[in-house]
UniProtKB/Swiss-Prot annotation:
It is an enzyme of class 2 (transferase). Its EC number is 2.4.2.7. This is Adenine phosphoribosyltransferase. It catalyses: AMP + diphosphate = 5-phospho-alpha-D-ribose 1-diphosphate + adenine. It comes from Finegoldia magna (strain ATCC 29328 / DSM 20472 / WAL 2508). Belongs to the purine/pyrimidine phosphoribosyltransferase family. Homodimer. It is found in: Cytoplasm. Keywords: Cytoplasm, Glycosyltransferase, Purine salvage, Transferase.
Length: 172
């Protein structure tokens, strides 16, 4: 199955000059969705992973399914103020300001081997922040797994010290 054929491309959304990759068409095709998850699972199954971490919101769509299939814990990585109780946070720079990500303080165990799963690798800033947050709390990043990679945006460059696998690549 060619996953790229299952992703709708919408030029000019959300604004001119953007070519939006709409994964809802893939999600609405049960065979394509299962195939994408199975490919991620196959890539990760022999890496000794103890947990999957995924940033909200679309990362949850793949991360939780992969965690379930591998029989490992799922760690939701959220925006500030979305998790009750004690959290650990990591701030990172954006082009025009800063942003922050949080996890429950007890979600990551020292020595955990964590794979980060998300729908899209673009500039790599968000996944890099997730990695730093996991490492700050004693986890080890074993892999980064994505449905889509926008290769021209250089997300691999700032994450070059991590293993990265992507299922579909676009230049832009």
């Amino acid at each position: 199955m060619e996953l790229k054929e299952k992703i709708r491309v919408i030029d000019g959304f959300p604004k001119e000059g953007i070519s939006f990759k709409d994964i809802t068409t893939l999600l609405n095709d049960k065979d394509a969705y299962k195939y994408a998850v199975d490919l991620m699972v196959d890539d990760l199954k022999d890496k000794g992973i103890t947990a999957i971490a995924a940033p909200e919101a679309r990362g949850f769509l793949f991360g939780s399914a992969v965690a379930y299939a591998l029989g490992v814990r799922f760690i939701p990585v959220r925006k500030p103020g979305k998790l009750p109780g004690e959290v650990s946070e990591y701030s990172y720079d954006l082009e025009y300001g800063t942003d922050k990500l949080e996890v429950h303080r007890d979600a990551i165990k020292k020595g955990d081997k964590v794979a980060i799963v998300d729908d899209l690798l673009a500039t790599g800033g968000t996944v890099n922040a997730v990695a730093k947050l996991i490492e700050k709390n004693g986890g080890e990043i074993t892999a980064m797994e994505f449905l889509i990679e926008l290769t021209e945006l250089g997300g691999r460059d700032i994450n070059k010290n991590y293993y990265i696998n992507t299922l579909v690549q676009y230049e832009s």
